[in-house]
């Protein structure tokens, strides 16, 4: 059986060339991209610098011998490759299923180019079936939860081992079960204005192409 995640991870690595500063994504699909970059560094002598989007990816990349720098140690990132939980026809998406949305977005906005790698199931007409992660500071989180309840957003705290999940940046995540997002831009602006919200999982206008894994092979879709 074809591993679609591995397929697109390896394909995305073809866009990486010597001298690049590369954003290394987080999650089960980006894992294979990082794995392939590590192989090329070891076997082909690929010369790149990686900038990671989570502590987990940093550990993985370091174990493969990929040279790493912090986002604050570089002026920009040439290319970031990451997974996504949903992608619509406008190349906007939802990310954060792996709880790394804040670091992922910091790296993405500092990148000259971003590619998302997904399987066919992640391509949707309208965002929202996947719960929208909202990263919030711990102080006042219950008040934010109640605010989202009043708005009808069906919130739930992200849990881990029976406790509220704490992100790499020491925040909580509230997942919003929106079912369907009618106006992505308006919701993003609303969340951006909400005090206590650190970041949200709506990624808008950040990517140039999506590599979609299919049984027939990877399909590269460019933004028009």
Swiss-Prot record:
Calcium among keywords: no
Active site per database record: 104
Biological-process GO terms, alphabetical: pentose-phosphate shunt, non-oxidative branch
Pathway noted in the entry: Carbohydrate degradation; pentose phosphate pathway; D-ribose 5-phosphate from D-ribulose 5-phosphate (non-oxidative stage): step 1/1
Pfam family of the protein (one): Rib_5-P_isom_A
Keyword Isomerase carried by entry: yes
GO molecular function: ribose-5-phosphate isomerase activity
Catalysis performed (reactions): aldehydo-D-ribose 5-phosphate = D-ribulose 5-phosphate
Highest taxon in the source lineage: Bacteria
Positions annotated to bind substrate: 26-29, 82-85, 95-98, 122
EC number, as in UniProt: 5.3.1.6
This protein's UniProt keywords: Isomerase
Family membership: Belongs to the ribose 5-phosphate isomerase family.
Function according to Swiss-Prot or TrEMBL: Catalyzes the reversible conversion of ribose-5-phosphate to ribulose 5-phosphate.
Subunit structure: Homodimer.
Protein name per the record: Ribose-5-phosphate isomerase A
